[in-house]
C-alpha cells in the first residue's frame, strides 16, 4: 500500500528528483500550495497540491508524466497543475481568485518562485466574484433539490461546497483591503464582520464539513437553507462593491 505522507515535505526530494528526471531542463519550478502549505493539512484526508511550471517544450511532453502522476495519486497527491510561465502570467486576469488563494499559502519546492511577482486587478477579482457567487448559488439550489431531503446528502453538499466559498471570502476581504486571516474559522468571522453576513451559519457549516457537529436532521436542513440565504445576500452586495 502506498504510504501517505504525514507532512508534505516528506516527499519533496523524491518528487523533485522524479520530475527533474522526466522533464530535465524544461522543468522551471515545483510549488506546493493549498492546505499542505498552510495549517489545515490533515494526513490521509487533505490532498497535496502542486503547481509545476514547464517550458513550452516541456508542456508538450506531458505524456511522459502519466505514470508518475498515477503513482503519486495513490499517496494523496492531487493531479498537479501543469502550466507554462506564459500561461501562468496570462491567467492573472482570467483566474485571479484561484491565483490569489494559491499565493496566500505556498512553498517553493524546487526552482523559481513563479508566484512572487503575480499581481491582481481588483476589477478582475470583482467580476470573477460575481460570476462565481451567482454560479455556485445556482448549484447549491439544484444540489439541494437533488438530495430529495436526504440529510446525509445535504451534509455532503455542505462539505463539498464550503471550501470554495471560503476561497471567495478571501477574495472579498482582498477587495476591501482587509488582511486575510490564516484559519478557515477566522476567515469566516472576518467576512461576516466586513459584509454583514451571518458568520454563525458558515461556522456551523464548517462543523458539518469537519464532521464534529451534533445537529439533528431538521437542524442540518435549517442550516443549509440559511446557508443559501446568506450566499444570496452576498450576491446582492457584490454589485455595490466599488473597486
Annotate each PLM feature.
Residues 23, 27:
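Active-site palm subdomain of RNA-directed nucleic acid polymerases
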Residues 28-36:
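Short gly/ser-rich loop at a beta-strand->alpha-helix junction or flexible surface loop bordering the NTP-binding
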Residues 17-21, 71, 108, 193, ...:
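A generic structural signal for well-ordered alpha-helical segments enriched in polar/charged residues
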Residues 2-22, 38-45, 51-95:
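Metal-dependent nucleotidyltransferase catalytic core
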Residues 1-2, 115:
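Short glycine/proline- and acidic residue-enriched helix-loop micro-motifs
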Residues 62, 66-156:
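Conserved NTP/Mg2+-binding pocket subregion across the NTase superfamily
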Residues 12, 119, 123-243:
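Conserved nucleotidyltransferase catalytic core and NTase-mimicking acidic/glycine-rich helix/loop elements
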Amino acid at each position: 500500500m502506498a504510504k501517505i505522507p504525514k507532512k508534505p515535505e516528506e516527499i519533496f526530494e523524491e518528487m523533485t528528483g522524479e520530475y527533474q528526471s522526466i522533464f530535465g531542463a524544461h522543468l522551471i519550478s515545483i510549488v506546493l500550495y493549498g492546505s499542505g502549505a498552510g495549517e489545515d493539512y490533515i494526513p490521509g484526508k487533505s490532498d497535496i497540491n502542486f503547481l509545476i511550471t514547464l517550458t513550452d517544450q516541456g508542456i508538450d511532453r506531458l505524456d511522459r508524466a502519466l505514470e508518475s502522476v498515477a503513482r503519486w495519486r495513490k499517496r494523496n497527491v492531487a493531479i498537479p497543475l501543469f502550466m507554462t510561465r506564459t500561461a501562468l502570467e496570462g491567467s492573472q486576469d482570467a483566474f485571479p481568485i484561484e491565483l490569489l488563494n494559491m499565493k496566500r499559502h505556498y512553498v517553493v519546492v524546487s526552482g523559481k518562485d513563479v508566484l512572487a511577482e503575480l499581481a491582481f486587478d481588483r476589477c478582475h477579482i470583482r467580476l470573477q466574484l460575481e460570476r462565481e457567487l451567482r454560479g455556485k448559488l445556482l448549484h447549491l439550489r439544484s444540489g439541494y433539490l437533488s438530495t430529495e431531503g436526504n440529510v446525509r446528502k445535504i451534509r455532503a453538499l455542505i462539505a463539498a461546497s464550503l471550501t470554495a466559498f471560503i476561497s471567495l471570502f478571501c477574495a472579498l476581504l482582498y477587495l476591501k483591503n482587509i488582511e486575510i486571516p490564516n484559519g478557515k474559522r477566522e476567515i469566516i468571522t472576518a467576512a461576516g464582520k466586513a459584509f454583514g453576513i451571518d458568520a454563525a451559519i458558515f461556522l456551523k457549516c464548517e462543523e458539518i464539513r469537519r464532521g464534529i457537529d451534533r445537529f439533528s436532521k431538521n437542524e442540518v436542513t435549517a442550516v443549509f437553507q440559511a446557508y443559501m440565504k446568506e450566499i444570496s445576500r452576498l450576491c446582492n452586495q457584490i454589485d455595490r462593491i466599488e473597486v
